[in-house]
Amino acid sequence: MNLGGCNDMSQISEYFRSIFFPNLGITLRNIGDHINIGSFEVRFYGIIIMIGFLLAYVLVTNEAKRTKQNPEMYLDFILILIIPAILGARLYYILFRLDQYIVQGDVGATIKAMLNIRGGGLAIYGGIIAGVITAVIFCKVRKVSFVLMADTATFGILIGQILGRFGNFFNREAFGAYTNSKMAMAIPLDYYRSDGNLDYLERTGVITQKMLDNVVNIDGMDCITVHPTFLYESLWNLMLLVFLFIYRKHKKFKGEFALIYVGGYGLGRFIVEGLRSDSLMIGDTGIKVSQALALVCFVIAVVLLVINYVRCAKRGWPAAVMGDAAGTEVKISGECDPADTEVETSGEADAAGTEVETSGGSDDAGEKKKDDKDATK
């Protein structure tokens, strides 16, 4: 094999770690998957996840301030969420890959393999499910609206997903089927040989026979060319986030942002998942778990959006989706109110549990004036 004049193993290793986009003329050299701090290895995937949580906090607290909620409440939630989200993502992945982790006759080795997340093996749907469960409990304890919190958290979830997919890039995973399209990404087979994973990836069908039949030689290295599905999904989520930023001043009802996210992400994931070669499957059915779940999410979200838009059209679109300066959302009779019938004060439940409603009818003050007038007659 010709490696372009490399004379030592470090140079050869750098070549193996190259990633190419040959049809775009892009070459990325020496793309590792970790850094060493002393004797400790830190995976880029983990670093990206932490950066994602930090940026999620920035976006979520910004949205909380805009909607007159308490931003500190979201900091509390994010700190609580980190461990359940990672555990949920890991358990979801393991559930559909049990054969990969179970070591017959050795419970200790099985548990160790399941807990070793440094080499990858996280599924976003598991993290979202764990996040929803955590949020429901959190909202019950804090006595705040789960739906309003879901709307606010949507911005953080999206930025986390946008960045998180680049962890797949560094790990050379979650890619799609063979392609020679303009966006084709080329990965040297020797990258997988170097860490002993090539045989496993071929055996499990992640690296397919079609990829091997269409190997291309770049700089003296045999490379598979695949769809960079991590990039497709990241760009799709970026478009969703930009749309929500543009649209957020026109919110029609509480829960709208969350439903737009669920439906939009479901549609994008359904399409992208169809291209992937490493999908988790439902037993031997040939059905991809994430694709099926994405379709269900898309359908449910669209149905709920249509129902709420029809309801809003019948009641009259709201004149404003925000409340007063104190952060109280006021229900105006006859309008489709984003707060439904709840009062949100700085993200905490109103101490009296009251609802504020204004309408064309008489209020308590009006009744009192009437009584006073009658008394003077």
Where are these regions (language model features)?
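A feature for loop-to-transmembrane-helix boundaries and adjacent hydrophobic helices
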Residues: 2-377
